[in-house]
Amino acid sequence: MIFNIAAYKPPATEKNLYKLAFFVTFHSLRLTFLKKMLKHKQQMVTCLHISWKSSNFANGNKNVDFSNIHNMKELALKYGCNPNQKPSRIYMDEGELPIEVLNGRPGYINFLDALNSWQLVKELKEATGMPAAASFKHVSPAGAAIGLPLSDTLKKIYFVDDVKVELSPLACAYARARGADRMSSYGDFVALSDTCDVATATLIKREVSDGVIAPDFTPEALQILKEKRKGTYNVIKIDPAYRPNPIEHKQVFGVTFEQGRNEVKLDDPALFENIPTQNKVFTDEAKRDLIISLITLKYTQSNSVCYVKDGQAIGIGAGQQSRIHCTRLAGNKADIWWLRQHPKVMNLPFVDGIRRADRDNTIDVYISEDHEDVLRDGTWQMFFKEKPEVLTMEEKKAWIAQNRGVALGSDAFFPFGDNIERAHKSGVEFIAQAGGSVRDDNVIDTCDKYGIAMAFTGVRLFHH
């Protein structure tokens, strides 16, 4: 029934006057309700759309398209960290999610990696003024870098020497972040500080990866990424202007933890004013690399140590209970990065058509003490055209000894000088750490023994 109140002329009776008042009141309330409905129409439609897609995906429909999901407070996920952890979602208590899913269907861990890695590259860009990239696995970086140009050697060991497009600064940052620890970066989540361009998308498409987050994507770059993984590659766009609440919360075993966000600025010159070592000289490049190291550690599971050289992390030791184990783990990764530049490694005669992952694995074994696993008769023919010579222990030690100018950051103080002894073996000449150990004197003496310049920042960077 449609009521035309303008044409209605009821008899002037008390009963009809009550009817008229009822219709006017009902019509006014309905208009108010419709206005509120229209105000939230987009959000309601999107949430219903997401719920339908999520339920269909959870019920086994793998052809559900999650692209162009935006303007929402909540996104239901297939499951949490593990398939048995249901239900799962990400949501905002206030406002809308600062992301858009442009392609794919990211999962719980994908979003953890995406949001942690985005903070890292955003902060690197703000601190250095250069495009930055990170490669994340299990909520810690495997690599992080800024967009310095690549030498021919780095292009070769990062497997980008055959790319036909000119590498942009962002593409160089990505190649460095992905290439530093290729074994750990396998199946990573990528973060980019700047709009993803064709050159960067071209490099990403070649690697085994779960997804990428960036403030934007050129149409051509987005099309390249949409073709990856048979159209299921996860592409997330984030609002670069988004600022989270300064107070953050998390739950453990039903108990809610609350703390202020870690918003310490790590490009503050004051961080390098307390230098207790005899060598007090930090070059501009060393300060830049130490800043990169500290920012990387800020988003790495503790305990953590990070070796940096020429604008990129070359060894990250994450999540170890012992500080010396962090230093050893990260140092070993830095040594492998450096050994990959040895002439014997760069000239390995791989068979034609070897897959990138197989090449990575073969190099890793060839460099290690288990080199016979790829060099024994009946095995080497699977990887090489001819049997390579062994890279001897003496050759490896001599090559590693040539590495110089490495910067090292730690997310907390070094308790003993053994960390410095190990760092020195991997070419460390500059260190930034919190200080405050009862054995600071031992740590300082060990630095002086090798002429290492060390700054006490007074800042702890635990991340859990």
For each feature predicted by the language model, list its residue ranges:
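Short, positively charged and aromatic/hydrophobic N-terminal segments
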Residues: 4, 25-28, 32, 39, ...
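Acidic, Ala/Val/Gly-enriched low-complexity intrinsically disordered segments
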Residues: 6-7, 12-14, 21-24, 45
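Active-site loops and adjacent core secondary-structure elements that bind or stabilize anionic groups
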Residues: 47-270, 286-304
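Gly-rich Lys/Arg/Thr-decorated short loops/hinges at beta-loop-alpha junctions or inter-strand turns
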Residues: 93-105, 180-186, 260-280, 357-379, ...
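Flexible, glycine/charged-enriched surface loops at secondary-structure junctions
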Residues: 127-135, 235-238, 302-309, 339-350, ...
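Active-site-proximal loop/turn and secondary-structure-junction residues that shape catalytic pockets
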Residues: 140, 196, 309-312, 320, ...
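Glycine- and Gly-Pro-enriched alpha-helical subdomains that act as flexible
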Residues: 142-182, 314-413
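C-terminal binding/interaction regions
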Residues: 192-193, 206-227, 231-234, 242, ...
